[in-house]
Each structure stands twice: as C-alpha cells, then as structure tokens.
Design a protein with these regions (language model features):
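Sec/Tat signal peptide C-region and signal peptidase I cleavage site
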Residues: 15-19
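Local sequence-structure signature of Cys/Sec-based thiol-disulfide redox active-site neighborhoods
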Residues: 22-68
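Structural alpha-beta junctions
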Residues: 66-81
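Sec-dependent N-terminal signal peptides
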Residues: 4-13
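Solvent-exposed loop/turn segments at secondary-structure junctions
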Residues: 53-56, 78-82, 103-104
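Structural micro-motif
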Residues: 87-99
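Structural recognition of the beta-strand scaffold that forms the well-ordered cores
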Residues: 46-49, 94, 106
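Non-catalytic, surface beta->alpha helical segment in thiol-disulfide oxidoreductase systems
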Residues: 97-135
C-alpha cells in the first residue's frame, strides 16, 4: 500500500512540475520565480498565458509540446486585475515568457484576438534563451 501511495504522489508531483495550471494575483510572483520540481539549480523558464473565457477558442493549445520550460500557467484576466495592470494586458490571449522571474518576451494578441505565437516561434525563443544563458 505504501508503494502505491508513493507512486501516486510521485506521479502527481511530476505532473505538477510540467503541467499547465491556473494562477491568480495572489500567487503570481511566486509562480514566475518557480524552480523545477526536481530542485535543480538550472534557470527557470516559466510561461504565463493571460486568458479570457470569451476567447478560449484562441488560447494557446500546444502548451504540452513546449520543451525546456519549468512550467506553463494560465491566468484569467477577469480574476487578476493586478497582474493585468502590471503587464499592461489589453487583449487575450497574451503570452509572456519569464526567465528566473524576469520578463523575456511578450506575445500580444491583435484585434483579431488570434493566438499571437505558434509553437515553433515560442520554442525557438525558449531555445535562444537557453543558449544565451550557457555562457
């Protein structure tokens, strides 16, 4: 029984380490500074998607295919006025890439409210961040 509980808790911690979760104003700063679930000392790359219920169809769909990130979060702009104001979010979806808690790149939706970035573009930028940090 202990082995089953251990395996389930390990699976949950693994999924929480690389999944997509929701964040709010109250935990936003903690989450963008978050490190890997494995506790390594490598840089932390966190992606936050500012999301709106009315535009869910245009949200970034390939978050589970992005490689080299610590975590991917969504934040509902209707429930996060402070983060929305701080990062000057006007349209959803807007996607921000943070490295060690510092904003590296921002992709903003236009008037068409389409997702502002493709998987390939996002992956290329993440790879650039990782390459630049190796020196």
């Amino acid at each position: 029984m202990k082995k089953i509980v251990f395996l389930i808790s390990l699976l949950i911690s693994f999924n929480n380490g690389f999944g997509q979760d929701w964040i709010t104003d109250s935990n936003f700063d903690d989450k963008i500074h978050e490190k890997s679930a494995f506790g390594d000392d490598e840089m932390s790359i966190v992606i936050v998607e500012f999301w709106a219920k009315f535009n869910d169809a245009n949200a970034f769909q390939d978050w589970d295919k992005v490689k080299g990130i610590t975590h991917y979060y969504r934040i509902d702009i209707a429930k996060a006025p402070n983060a929305k104001k701080e990062y000057r979010i006007r349209m959803a979806p807007t996607i921000i890439v943070f490295k060690d808690g510092i904003k590296e790149e921002m992709y903003k939706a236009g008037l068409d409210l389409e997702c502002p970035v493709t998987l390939d573009e996002l992956q290329e930028h993440i790879n650039e961040i990782k390459s630049a940090s190796q020196f």
